[in-house]
C-alpha cells in the first residue's frame, strides 16, 4: 500500500500538471471516498509538509530502507509457494533505490527530457483500488497456505477486525471485504472477480500512460499480471514443464 501511494505520487508529479497542493487535493478527495485509509491520510500530511519554506518530500533523498518485515513475508511466500508479487515489487523498488551511484550514472547516459502528459484521475483511482484488492488477495492466500501447512487456525475475518483497529493498514477497504466478499475463500468469490474485471481497463490505461512516459509505477503492472494469470486456465507454464522434463524426469502431467 505504501508503494502504491508512492507510485501514484510519482506519476502525478512527473506529469508536470500536478504540484504538491493539487496532489494533496486529489488524495483528500480519495480519503473521503471508498479509498479512505490511514496511509493515505498520513501521505496527505507528508505531501504538504514544509521545512524552510520548501516541501519536505522534495528534499528527502530517495534511498529507502526496510526493517526486515517485508523480507520475512517474502521468505514465507516462497516457502509456502504463494505469490506475493506486489510485496516483492515494492521491496525490489527499495533495493534498487539504494543503487544511487549506478542510477546517477545511467540517468546521465539515458537523458530524459522534461515532459507533460495527461492523467485520467478517475481511471487512476480505479486502478489504485484494483491493486489494493489484489494486495489483500495475496495476503489472504498466504494466510490460508500457512493455516494448511502449519496447522494454524487463523481466521481472516478476525484478522481483518484486528487490522481495522489501530493498524497502519486501517482502511475503508477492510469494511468492503467484510460486507461484499467471502474473505475466507477469496478466489472463489465471483463478486470480487467481477469487480476486478470492471476495473481492469482503468489499470491498463494507467500503466500505458506510465510506460509511454518512462515513469516507473511499481506494483501496478504486477497486480495486472497476477489477475491475468489467476483468471486464465491456460498459462505459459506447460513450456516450463517441458523444459524441465528435458533435463530429467520431472513428473509432467499429460491432459
Where are the model-predicted features located?
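C-terminal substrate-binding/catalytic lobe of Rossmann-fold NAD(P)-dependent dehydrogenases
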Residues: 2-217
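C-terminal amphipathic alpha-helical interaction region
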Residues: 197-198, 202-255
Amino acid at each position: 500500500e505504501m508503494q502504491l501511494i508512492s507510485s501514484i505520487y510519482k506519476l502525478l508529479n512527473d506529469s508536470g500538471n500536478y504540484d504538491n497542493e493539487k496532489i494533496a487535493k486529489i488524495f483528500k478527495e480519495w480519503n473521503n471516498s471508498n479509498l479512505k485509509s490511514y496511509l493515505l491520510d498520513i501521505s496527505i500530511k507528508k505531501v504538504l509538509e514544509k521545512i524552510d519554506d520548501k516541501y519536505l518530500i522534495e528534499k528527502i533523498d530517495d534511498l529507502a530502507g526496510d526493517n526486515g518485515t517485508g523480507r520475512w513475508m517474502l521468505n514465507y511466500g516462497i516457502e509456502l509457494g504463494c505469490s506475493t508479487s506486489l510485496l516483492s515489487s515494492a521491496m525490489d523498488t527499495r533495493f534498487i533505490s539504494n543503487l544511487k551511484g549506478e542510477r546517477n550514472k545511467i540517468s546521465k547516459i539515458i537523458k530524459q527530457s522534461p515532459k507533460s502528459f495527461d492523467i485520467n484521475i478517475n481511471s487512476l483511482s480505479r486502478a489504485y483500488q484494483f491493486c489494493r484488492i489484489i494486495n489483500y488477495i495475496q495476503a489472504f492466500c498466504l494466510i490460508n497456505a500457512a493455516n494448511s501447512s502449519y496447522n494454524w487456525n487463523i481466521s481472516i475475518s478476525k484478522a481483518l477486525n484486528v487490522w481495522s483497529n489501530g493498524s497502519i493498514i486501517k482502511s475503508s477497504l477492510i469494511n468492503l471485504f467484510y460486507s461484499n466478499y467471502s474473505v475466507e475463500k477469496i478466489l472463489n468469490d465471483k463478486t470480487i472477480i467481477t469487480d476486478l474485471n470492471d476495473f481492469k481497463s482503468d489499470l491498463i490505461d494507467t500503466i500505458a500512460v506510465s510506460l509511454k512516459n518512462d515513469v516507473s509505477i511499481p506494483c501496478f503492472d504486477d497486480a495486472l499480471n497476477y489477475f491475468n494469470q489467476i483468471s486464465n486456465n491456460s498459462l505459459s507454464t506447460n513450456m516450463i514443464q517441458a523444459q524441465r522434463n528435458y533435463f530429467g524426469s520431472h513428473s509432467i502431467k499429460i491432459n
